[in-house]
Curated annotation (Swiss-Prot):
Species of the source: Borrelia garinii subsp. bavariensis (strain ATCC BAA-2496 / DSM 23469 / PBi) (Borreliella bavariensis)
Subcellular location(s) of the protein: Cytoplasm
Official protein name in the record: Ribosomal RNA small subunit methyltransferase I
GO cellular component: cytoplasm
Keywords of the record: Cytoplasm, Methyltransferase, rRNA processing, S-adenosyl-L-methionine, Transferase
UniProt function note: Catalyzes the 2'-O-methylation of the ribose of cytidine 1402 (C1402) in 16S rRNA.
Disulfide bonds: none
Length: 224
């Protein structure tokens, strides 16, 4: 059995009892970064063999995963934060397990997407998850314009050092876009701000501390 386990996005208390039980019961844990996952395992007194499996190495770890499953071992996969499958490795492992006829079981948990949507103040009928945009170039701007033109709200992930650039890019598409920004969600310095692109740019550029951390951005065209 391959378990795909949702883990916290910041606060280590944000994990289900079921997820903890699964991590305690499996034979081995494939982790995006073992240095990150060891903190979670230590918090819940879980001592298991871990194997690093990230976006670069995932394809090479498929054979190892299948070897474990062939022996009848149970395996869990966890990303650094949140529920695997969105902007994280894991899909290649899942595809291989399905292809070879092994059972795959999702263990739901928190994600940046459902966290930001839960505090969305705009009345959007649908919300798309885009995740990380291309780092630079015309492709990045075109993607923002394409997403905005569709009319659905959409969610982006961005690092602090590119946040101001992103807000300028969104303003180039629409000065009136409605934006909800979650900074360091569930962590010590968690905060949420709403406004139009240039209003938010002014707020976040007012202090270097404000652009530190990880950002989740919901962009809306809602009229309400």
């Amino acid at each position: 059995m391959l378990y795909i386990v949702g883990t916290p996005i910041g606060n280590l208390e944000d994990i289900t009892y079921r997820a903890v039980d699964v991590l305690k019961s499996v034979n081995v844990i494939f982790a995006e970064d073992t240095r990150v996952t060891i903190k979670l395992l230590s918090r819940y007194k879980i001592n298991k063999k871990m194997i690093s499996c990230n976006a670069v190495t995932e394809n090479k770890k498929i054979r190892l995963l299948l070897d474990y499953l062939a022996k009848g071992d149970s395996v869990a996969f966890v990303s650094d934060a949140g529920t695997p499958g969105l902007s994280d490795p894991g899909s290649l492992l899942v595809a291989a397990a399905f292809r070879e006829g092994y059972k795959v079981c999702p263990i739901p948990g928190v994600s940046s997407f459902n966290t930001i949507v839960s505090v969305n103040p705009f009345r959007d009928k649908s919300v798309l998850f885009e995740g990380f945009l291309p780092n630079k170039g015309l492709k990045r701007f075109k993607k923002i314009a394409e997403l905005y033109k569709r009319g659905d709200a959409f969610v982006l992930l961005e690092s602090g050092h590119r946040l101001l650039k992103l807000l300028v890019e969104i303003s180039s598409v629409s000065l009136d876009a409605k934006i909800l920004i979650g900074r360091e969600m569930t962590k010590i310095y968690e905060e949420y701000q709403i406004g139009k692109p240039l209003e938010l740019k002014k707020y976040f550029e007012s202090s270097k501390e404000k652009v530190k951390g990880e950002f989740t951005i919901l962009v809306s065209r809602s009229s309400s």
